[in-house]
Amino acid sequence: MQKLSEEMKQTIMDIFEHLHANPEVSWKEYETTSFLKQKLEDLGCRTRTFSDCTGVVGEIGSGSPVVAVRADIDALWQEVNGTFRANHSCGHDSHMTMALGTLMLLKKQPELPKGTIRFIFQPAEEKGGGALKMIEEGVLDDIDYLYGVHVRPIQETQNGRCAPSILHGSSQHIEGTIIGEEAHGARPHLGKNSIEIAAFLVHKLGLIHIDPQIPHTVKMTKLQAGGESSNIIPGKASFSLDLRAQTNEAMEALIAETERACEAAAAAFGAKIELHKEHSLPAATQNKEAEAIMAEAITEIIGAERLDDPLVTTGGEDFHFYAVKVPNLKTTMLGLGCGLQPGLHHPHMTFDRNAMFTGIHILANAVLKTFQKAESLAAANAS
């Protein structure tokens, strides 16, 4: 496989600088989509955009198999140096850059194998709905293999090392309402204090126990109750719960136990607790075939001594909706060690930008290896 030239590296770094300097939040990645579309077309891709959402898809080649590379494109809204603004603190600017760089590198190869290479620039990963929208739009219908990439913090792996898959956990966000009864502060026995009910619920949540061998947590992350007056016992409160589990099965059990805890807390006070499940993310589903291809690609580029085992992380990622919702799709996500610190989603997150070149070489190698595997299988079946 041909490698990136110094001229290509500079072009790739320029792309990153532009994307890094122009972050846009979920579902509002308008300029980002336009920029990516132009770059894809400049590189000879057929492109597709969507009438009711951001994001863009580009592809080269034709026929099967269809191998795809996915990059998320949205930024986070967070406080940076005292000002709230969009900020690429989850590395999506680097993911977009690596996907475009992979396309550039593949186009430089003397010959590409028969088949289609698709590049999916997906919106709204941070909101958890972008992957589902791409599935709804039929972007994944004919894909055989799908590869993603995510930069990893130093707490997980060192700069210069890579993992063939990232095993994210499942997450579930729940909004709840406590309906008690207001009363005068001097007559608490006539009311049902929603703050006391919430405190009891926090205690009940802490008593939830499922299989201890599977990492899991449930906690209240937001509580709002009462108004301007401190002498009124609040009858109503709203709260948020954040649930995490390393497997989808454990998440189902955790949700059931959480619902039981809420029922018990409400019954103890003769109150009501209403729950509304908001966005959720599935845990990763390991595909050994795609993972093995990625491991081979990593080994050829940086050596077996720098190949990590699959990374297990409690974070969530909507990339895994693709494996759950699309039958027979083979997926894996490259975990790129890049010296990222102090951590993902930190407003001042930094990483070694030269690591993107490693990611590009690995992704391009994985794509080529996938086609080679398909050709070998077809030849074996023909004989």
Curated annotation (Swiss-Prot):
Domain of life: Bacteria
Record Gene3D superfamilies: 3.30.70.360, Zn peptidases (3.40.630.10)
Keyword DNA damage tagged: no
EC number: 3.5.1.-
GO terms for MF: hydrolase activity
This protein's UniProt keywords: Hydrolase
Top enzyme category: hydrolase
Keyword Hydrolase on entry: yes
InterPro entries per the UniProt record, alphabetical: AmhX-like (IPR037484), Amidohydrolase (IPR017439), Bact_exopeptidase_dim_dom (IPR036264), Peptidase_M20 (IPR002933), Peptidase_M20_dimer (IPR011650)
Family: Belongs to the peptidase M20 family.
Protein name: Amidohydrolase AmhX
